[in-house]
Swiss-Prot record:
This is Protein teg. Keywords: Hydrolase, Lipid degradation, Lipid metabolism. A motif (GXGXXG) lies at residues 11-16. The gene is teg. Signal peptide: none annotated. It comes from the Bacteria. Pfam families: Patatin. Residues 7-182 form the PNPLA domain. Its EC number is 3.1.1.-.
Length: 318
């Protein structure tokens, strides 16, 4: 019987509705799923879910707040964003997160262990920038950090939002936090690999692809061309203004976030074998900042066959 149980949540902005509805279905079928979990981890919007559960909130309560308070923060899109301007005003998300979590709630106060990635743009003690894995395992240097600050640091996506307290989104470190969570279970909780089970919940597998010839591409233009009119900007690694429906708007950034998620799943699966389960249904190429996609995401979550996930939980959580 597996003894050390971990649930991870990917980042994905408004796509977090998919993982939250999947979680609610799983928890309804398995009432002890949350209470029997040792570690909750997540990146960006997944860090909100992870810390909400770790603080004692139910999946239903967490999803209700997401729909009622967090989604409206994404409803305002600035002109030119995310290519020429910060896309989403960050003030709405800051207010929502600080409303949900008590102002004085620290990582040391959480009822469960957590792991949350972010990227520190300047770490004075190192005199450089640095990836950070916030956690509350024994001996953590982050125990006094506010839960709300940790979530907002992990959710500050470049181009979409601004940096928060000189940190940017955890997807620059790990979109999928499965491998990091396994590492903490082994290194901090002293658990052998054969006693660890991970349920990794994504925000949807999209058909993102890039088939065109990338010869000559730079980060903001191509073939040393500086267009006089930005509407005629040639394709490049920074932005595709002439993209097809399944091509990435921001190729370089989306390669980092998408590639990281697949990589983490592959490594975690190699480490744990059948004690790792990835739940990440296929979805259309939805925007991560568009609240209008949420009803479709909920519908996809409700139609997803969860029998394999139920069987995995039955083997490892009961």
């Amino acid at each position: 019987m597996t003894k050390y149980r971990i649930i991870t949540f990917d980042g994905g902005g408004t796509l977090g509705a998919l993982s939250l509805q999947l979680l609610n279905r799983l928890a309804y079928q398995n009432p002890k799923l949350i209470s029997e979990t040792n570690v909750f981890s997540g990146n960006s919007i997944g860090s909100f879910t992870a810390l909400a559960l770790a603080s004692g909130r139910s999946p239903e309560e967490t999803f209700d707040f997401f729909k009622d308070q967090i989604l409206p923060a994404f409803s305002v899109s600035r002109p030119g964003g995310p290519v020429f301007n910060q896309q989403v005003p960050y003030s709405g998300l800051i207010k929502a997160i600080r409303t949900f979590f008590p102002r004085d709630l620290r990582l040391r106060d959480l009822k469960k262990r957590i792991v949350v990635p972010a990227f520190h743009l300047f770490a004075p003690e190192l005199n450089r920038w640095n990836p950070v894995l916030f956690h509350n395992f024994l001996g953590s240097p982050y125990l006094n950090e506010k839960a709300s600050d940790v979530i907002l640091r992990s959710s500050a996506a470049p181009a979409t939002q601004r940096a928060y307290q000189n940190y940017v989104d955890g997807y620059t470190v790990a979109t999928n936090t499965s491998t990091a969570s396994i590492a903490f279970a082994v290194g901090k909780a002293k658990q052998p690999l054969d006693q660890i089970a991970v349920l990794s919940i994504g925000t949807g597998e999209q058909p993102t692809q890039l088939r065109r010839d990338t010869k000559g591409w730079g980060m903001v233009s191509a073939d040393n061309i500086l267009p006089e009119d930005m509407e005629d900007l040639p394709p490049n690694w920074g932005v595709l203004l002439d993209r097809s429906p399944n091509e990435p708007l921001l190729p370089f950034l989306q390669i980092i976030s998408g590639g990281s998620s697949y990589y983490e799943s592959m490594v975690s699966s190699e480490l744990l074998g059948d004690q790792f389960f990835r739940l990440n249904p296929r979805i259309p190429n939805f925007s991560k900042t568009d609240p209008s996609v949420v009803p479709a995401l909920i519908s996809i979550a409700n139609k997803t066959n969860l029998r394999p996930a139920f069987q995995f939980i039955e083997r490892n959580w009961n």
